[in-house]
Amino acid sequence: MISKCTFSATVFSLFSLCWGAPSSPVLEAPHTIPLPAAMRVQTGESGFSLKNGVRLPEKNPLSRQAERIFRDNGINTALVKNNADIIFTEDASLGREGYRLAVTPDSISIASGSVNGTLYALQSLVQSIAADKNGAPALPRMDVKDQPRFSWRGLMVDSCRHMMPVRDIKKVLDLMERYKFNTLHWHLTDDQGWRLPIAKYPRLTTVGGARAQSPVIGNRNKGDGIPYSGHYTADEIRDVVRYARDRGITVIPEVEMPGHASAAIAAYPELGNTDIPGYEPRVQETWGVHSYTFSPTEKTFRFLEDVIDEICALFPDSPYIHIGGDEAPKNQWKQSPTAQRVMKDNGLANEHELQSYFIRRVEKMINNRGKRLIGWDEIQEGGLSPTATMMVWRSQMPHIAAQALAQGNDIVMTPNSHLYFDYDQGPGKPAAPEYETINNNQLTWQHVYGLEPVPQGTPREREKQVLGCQANIWTEYIPNLPKWEYHVFPRALALAEVAWTPQELKNEKDFRKRLDRQLPFLDARGVNYKRPDNGAPAQPKAVITRERR
């Protein structure tokens, strides 16, 4: 007769063998994107078997993240008190985003300096899953030591022209996590809509969040006659911020000023230049640049201070507030006696200096709340604050980046020559009329992959001021997620490698092989990417239409 104690020990031993047994030989090397900084893989040998899942240490808080990531990739997990398969250790020398990863037939060890480093190690792990010789899932033996080249690896969501529902933003965040992006730039206010809830000023969303119509997709000169409105609630904003945080992503909010302010001024007309002829503010129904700018008065600055207070509460994780600062026409300020009086009282020579004065006033509010100002490269016009961070988007003006770096400012590279993903991916004709774009620039994934974020001629001692790079996706002609995905993927994977991988390790042919191995994952997630071979949408039945809001 077998005693109960002996039987329990036997079952536990079998359970341990079942979970911890080495795999059959793993023949396939990882197809990780972005490519790690240093990786040694031993194929043709036994690896770590995933046939029965992974045991995680139940008392380690990192196991919650590991459980989520493994299960999202079809691997079972179990929380155990002893004999865990993954060993987590902390190593501050690896920095905030670096990690070490070792896989043997018996265990997986992850060392990192923070939760973010652990997340990146886990993403490298699940991207390395392959079939062993018997067809079972396994990890090859490997050693990885990795860290990103740049600290800012971003994508932008423009919710003003077309509003992206929270469920879709979460899908975007899931994809960003896989490819080690760490910044979501959320464009929340513009001429065509204000989507950010500000409790003290409810008309910003009830009035500023609604436009009478939009241009027909593919024809900016013709209206569709369909009202369009919407905004996020405070709870939705907090939900997105939390969801992003769990995936190692910081959400940077953008509120446009002093230009691109039509929606705010339509909601509260006293914020505009009320003393000019023909003053009739409204939420704009057409795309492009519009003339309505905030008036540089104390009333406006009190309003902006209130808005910034609420932004800080909604986005506590963000070290920055993005204030736009781009494409601010000066004609209303030139016509406004009030604006001219502000210029005279403050010794400002022209309207460009008035814009700089405006931005410096706002920057002081932001800095006083423990955050930093970031804006588009036009914030340099009239003089740039030494503590501001600048997003460089005008590739046709390379001196802008050089001037900011020479002054000591940090920059993020978002050049429209490479990283405006609303531009057509090319090559090939659009799959259908609704896939047309108004811009015929063909920015292929190869073109994106060829980007060098550090501007040519940058002195070595200034290179650290180049924080990284980001793709911008303006949504005038991108009405919903399937069209957004068609523009963003696979180019986002090329950008992920540009932003992460050491320059000397980049290889376009090798990247293409790894890209092809990523496509089944995108297919499984229902991503409507543009197929790199023929330009067709991956989800041909996806509906590319503007939802009535």
Curated annotation (Swiss-Prot):
The keyword Oxidoreductase is annotated on this UniProt entry: no
Top-level taxon in the UniProt lineage: Bacteria
Keywords: Carbohydrate metabolism, Glycosidase, Hydrolase, Polysaccharide degradation, Signal
InterPro entries in alphabetical order: Beta_hexosaminidase_sua/sub, Glyco_hydro_20_cat, Glycoside_hydrolase_SF, Hex-like_dom2, HEX_bac_N
Catalysed reaction equations from the record: Hydrolysis of terminal non-reducing N-acetyl-D-hexosamine residues in N-acetyl-beta-D-hexosaminides
GO cellular component, one term: membrane
EC number: 3.2.1.52
Active-site residues per Swiss-Prot or TrEMBL entry: D190, H260, E327
Iron recorded as keyword: no
Matches recorded under Pfam families: Glyco_hydro_20, Glyco_hydro_20b
Sequence positions that bind substrate: R161, D326, W393, Y420, F421, D422, W474, T475, E476
Entry's pH dependence statement: Optimum pH is approximately 7. Stable activity from pH 4.5 to 8.5. Retains more than 30% of activity at pH 9.0.
Endpoints of the signal sequence: 1-28
Temperature dependence: Highest activity at 45 degrees Celsius. Has about 40% of activity at 55 degrees Celsius.
GO biological process terms held by the UniProt record: glycosaminoglycan metabolic process; polysaccharide catabolic process
Recorded GO MF terms: beta-N-acetylhexosaminidase activity
Activity control: Inhibited strongly by Cu(2+), Zn(2+), Cd(2+) and Ni(2+) ions. No effect on activity with Na(+), Li(+), K(+), Ca(2+), Mg(2+) or Mn(2+) ions.
Record region (Disordered): 526-549
Broad class of enzyme this protein falls into: hydrolase
Family from the record: Belongs to the glycosyl hydrolase 20 family.
Record function comment: Potentially capable of cleaving the specific glycoside linkages in the process of mucin degradation in human intestinal tract. Hydrolyzes chromogenic substrates pNP-beta-GlcNAc with high activity and pNP-beta-GalNAc to a lesser extent, but not pNP-beta-glucose or pNP-beta-galactose.
Protein name as annotated: Beta-hexosaminidase Amuc_0868
